[in-house]
Amino acid sequence: MAFNFTAFTYIVALIGDAFLIFFAIFHVIAFDELKTDYKNPIDQCNSLNPLVLPEYLLHLFLNLLFLFCGEWYSLCLNIPLIAYHIWRYKNRPLMSGPGLYDPTTVLKTDTLSRNLREGWIKLAVYLISFFYYIYGMVYSLIST
């Protein structure tokens, strides 16, 4: 059982993906609170907007590690979500700071349901990725 760069990449990806899962869970909880009217949109957007860039950068960093170690299947598994993140950030509402969520439009029914659905889909993708990364780590440790 040898430790190599691929195993290190999968270990870092597991830790990073755990953070991404927590980001997605927070995203779902935050929009559910908005849907049930537990919090006002200004406070909720002020707590969600600072987490957008760290989530996107962490996901991009993990995939750069996969690119450097030549794990093409893991990279291809994440390319659609990277493309969606880039598209979503380029088409964000015009605001003074970084972030995606505008307090004036976040309570619209279609925007709220789209953001909630986005959170659930991201949570599913990150969970599937987490278990695949466990498999990849074990496989890379055993195969060498």
UniProtKB/Swiss-Prot annotation:
Lumenal topological domain ranges are 1-10, 78-122
User: Gene Ontology terms, cellular component aspect?
Assistant: endoplasmic reticulum membrane
Return the Pfam families for the record: Cornichon
Q: Where is this region: Interaction with grk?
A: 1-57
Recite the UniProt keywords alphabetically.
Answer: Developmental protein, Endoplasmic reticulum, ER-Golgi transport, Membrane, Protein transport, Receptor, Transmembrane, Transmembrane helix, Transport
Chain ranges sitting on the Cytoplasmic side read: 32-56, 144
Q: Does the keyword Nucleus apply?
A: no
Location comes to: Endoplasmic reticulum membrane
Signal sequence residues = none
Tell me if rRNA-binding is a UniProt keyword of this record. no
Name the residues that span the membrane. Answer: 11-31, 57-77, 123-143
Q: Which GO terms describe its biological process?
A: anterior/posterior pattern specification; blastoderm segmentation; dorsal appendage formation; endoplasmic reticulum to Golgi vesicle-mediated transport; oocyte dorsal/ventral axis specification; protein transport
Q: PROSITE patterns recorded for this chain?
A: CORNICHON (PS01340)
> Principal place where this protein is found?
endoplasmic reticulum
Entry membrane topology:
Multi-pass membrane protein
Quote the subunit structure annotation. Interacts with grk.
Q: What does this protein do?
A: Acts as a cargo receptor necessary for the transportation of gurken (grk) to a transitional endoplasmic reticulum (tER) site and promotes its incorporation into coat protein complex II (COPII) vesicles. Associated with gurken, produces a signal received by torpedo resulting in a signaling pathway that first establishes posterior follicle cell fates and normal localization of the anterior and posterior determinants, later they act in a signaling event inducing dorsal follicle cell fates and regulating the dorsal-ventral pattern of egg and embryo.
Q: Describe the family membership recorded for this protein in Swiss-Prot or TrEMBL.
A: Belongs to the cornichon family.
**What PANTHER family does the record tag this protein with?**
CORNICHON-RELATED
Q: What is this protein called?
A: Protein cornichon
Q: Which organism is it from?
A: Drosophila virilis
